[in-house]
A protein has these predicted regions:
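Bacterial N-terminal signal peptides that target proteins for export
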Residues: 1-9
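Bacterial N-terminal signal peptides
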Residues: 9-17
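Sec/Tat signal peptide C-region and signal peptidase I cleavage site
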Residues: 19-23
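Expand to "…catalyze enediolate/carbanion chemistry for C-C bond making/breaking, isomerization
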Residues: 24-334
């Protein structure tokens, strides 16, 4: 019994020492150089991220979606009218090699009509948006960013803590300090391929691979899918996490919880009062937080959606998107 007790004490001491060492490593030395957060963008000319360019002009953006695909699919989609492409790996194959090849195809078949090297690419991942899942799977966020994408949409984003962990996983340890965020954890080497996809030096990539608009020089966008009642309960807090730029309300998954089936529409409107209430809550939360709201749009609803404040619409290559671009008098090439 005495040996077991001593062994238990030793294990507890070892665990405590290990956790203390990890905690100490997470705190930068007092003399470590920490750049100040710029108050406004210091770069001039076209942004890397086409979405940001459009938003800075007050324009809504439109996206298309692909579930996986490599080099050839990237080449084919380089000519899209869409401002960005959702590369769907929540339910599609989780294949980071293919993602890298897709980005290379976009780059080599570019530039876009607007003069950007590629359309922006936002990735979804099979990470449940809970605190424990984010702690265990932050590597997926870092792998996606290392492929040169322009942002992450966190699915089933249930808690502010999960949103915060996503942002911290995406930032480098030397990034400007931000109240409400711990030091970033993204590692050296992640800049090599990504900087080539962006057409910048590795050093410049590490400076601008930051969440926008938190960092005015940032070129990365991070969003939340509010898709279930647990996420609804925290939405007003989650959307205020530093570094979050947009959110959507996930009607398909919400329908499972509210109606026992995927959400249904009639001309874009919700057929269930409960679903309409969920959408309204998420929309109001984004407006209060000063971030963008994403919603499905079709030809019958796109104008009303834009009037309501929707700044991200589906159907990047569709007549609905063309109708929306004309309504907001977009001057950039379609």
């Amino acid at each position: 019994m005495m040996k077991k007790a001593l062994l238990l004490v030793a294990l507890v001491m070892l665990t405590t020492m290990t956790m203390t060492a990890i905690a100490q490593q997470a705190v930068p030395p007092e003399n470590a150089p920490v750049p100040a957060m710029p108050k406004e963008a210091t770069r001039t000319g076209k942004r890397v991220n086409r979405i940001i360019d459009m938003w800075l002009k007050g324009q809504p953006v439109y996206y298309s979606q692909i579930s996986g695909g490599g080099y050839e699919q990237g080449k084919q989609m380089a000519a899209t009218k869409a401002d960005y492409i959702t590369y769907e790996m929540e339910h599609g194959p989780l294949d980071f090699k293919e993602l890298r090849e897709f980005m290379r195809g976009l780059l080599e078949a570019g530039p876009t009509r607007t003069g950007h090297k590629t359309p922006a690419v936002i990735v979804t991942l099979p990470i449940p948006g809970t605190t424990d899942a984010l702690r265990a799977n932050a590597w997926m966020i870092q792998q996606a960013l290392a492929a040169g994408v322009h942002g992450i949409l966190l699915c089933n984003a249930e808690s502010p803590e999960a949103a915060r962990l996503m942002i911290e996983a995406a930032r480098y340890p030397f990034a400007p300090r931000v109240d409400g965020l711990a030091q970033g954890t993204r590692g050296n080497g992640s800049q090599a391929y990504a900087s080539r996809m962006w057409g910048v030096t590795a050093e410049e990539y590490m400076r601008i691979a930051e969440p926008w608009p938190l960092n005015p020089d940032g070129e990365l966008l991070f969003g939340l899918k509010i898709e279930n009642p647990r996420a609804d309960a925290n939405v007003e807090t989650s959307v205020r996490v530093p570094g979050i730029a947009f959110a959507e309300w996930g009607p398909g998954d919400h329908g499972f919880y509210v109606m026992g089936r995927p959400g249904t529409y009639k001309d874009g409107g919700e057929t269930s009062p409960q679903m309409a209430a969920v959408r309204r809550r998420v929309l109001n939360a984004t407006k209060a937080a000063g971030i963008k709201f994403l919603n499905a749009c079709n030809e019958n609803t796109v104008i009303d959606q834009l009037k309501e404040g929707v700044m991200i619409c589906t159907g990047g290559d569709s007549p609905a998107a063309d109708k929306g671009r004309a309504f907001t008098k977009r001057t950039d090439p379609w």
